Amino acid sequence: MTTTPFNRLLLTGAAGGLGKVLRERLKGYAEVLRLSDISPMAPAAGPHEEVITCDLADKAAVHTLVEGVDAIIHFGGVSTEHAFEEILGPNICGVFHVYEAARKHGVKRIIFASSNHTIGFYRQDERIDAHAPRRPDSYYGLSKCYGEDVASFYFDRYGIETVSIRIGSSFPQPQNLRMLCTWLSYDDLVQLIERGLFTPGVGHTIVYGASDNRTVWWDNRHAAHLGYVPKDSSETFRAAVEAQPAPAADDPSMVYQGGAFAVAGPFN
């Protein structure tokens, strides 16, 4: 990691599953880590932390939240499939509000938590790179496609650079056969964020967030300039995962890269 940390970093979604992990892992990257979520956060702000409750759907609140930060790690929003109306505010309005606030306050680097669900309708026997047409598998995936488009637009129009991480499955360990291919360890996630923050000239880069798993569906050649070299592998957990009852061959988790998201809903 660089020896010159940021003065103030903003982490949205800090009360979420990955947000809690990153709160602990990112402390050395800035003099002050500003933490934000719509949900209460515990523990209270510690040394070199600021805790701010913020609804991403509230444009004025997001504008205030972003003031004074040097870079943004945007992990806030709904992180699973829901009705479109529930995703609209935090994921679609929210990402626009974050980028507008970044523009107004002169923030030039953002890490955007995108998702493998932007391409979830590709089949598991297909190998794709970041230039493959997107095939979202859900309203959630659709919202992440929009977020990537916002990132692209704000770079082309305003020079705000973004690394969009299409996160696979970031958990302590893979939980099923699909995750043997999509698993992203916490250490490798942090490495991706580090490379996204400190690599010069990223423009808008899309990178697939997966560890060094034996079976891979995603080709990161278009993000090679980041220098991301995953250190972990799902092979450590293969025996335990394969000991579980196997899903049917036509189960969505065995057919589509996005797994069960491809058949979630409809929501009335």
Swiss-Prot record:
GO terms for molecular function: nucleotide binding; uronate dehydrogenase activity. Activity increases with increasing temperatures between 4 and 42 degrees Celsius. Activity is below 20% of the maximum after exposure at 37 degrees Celsius for 30 minutes. NAD(+) binds at residues 17-18, 37-39, 55-56, 75-79, 144, 170. Optimum pH is about 7. Keywords: NAD, Nucleotide-binding, Oxidoreductase. It is an enzyme of class 1 (oxidoreductase). Signal peptide: none annotated. InterPro entries: Epimerase_deHydtase, NAD(P)-bd_dom_sf. The active site is at residue 140. Catalyzes the oxidation of beta-D-galacturonate and beta-D-glucuronate to galactarate and D-glucarate, respectively. Homohexamer. This is Uronate dehydrogenase. It comes from Pseudomonas putida (strain ATCC 47054 / DSM 6125 / CFBP 8728 / NCIMB 11950 / KT2440).
